[in-house]
Amino acid sequence: AGSKVVGYFTEWGTYDRKYYVKNIEXS
């Protein structure tokens, strides 16, 4: 379960960064 959580957070963090940058470019 531990490694599964780490993989989830890593994947979500990458997506969140892309979305954040996209948001800045749009404004």
Swiss-Prot record:
Its EC number is 3.2.1.14. The keyword Hydrolase applies. PROSITE patterns: GH18_2. Gene3D superfamilies: Glycosidases. GO terms for biological process: chitin catabolic process; polysaccharide catabolic process. Keywords: Carbohydrate metabolism, Chitin degradation, Glycosidase, Hydrolase, Polysaccharide degradation. InterPro entries: Glyco_hydro18_cat (IPR001223). Residues 3-27 form the GH18 domain. It is an enzyme of class 3 (hydrolase). Belongs to the glycosyl hydrolase 18 family. Chitinase class II subfamily. Able to cleave chitin oligomers from N=3 to 6. Homodimer. This is Chitinase 47 kDa. It comes from Streptomyces olivaceoviridis (Streptomyces corchorusii).
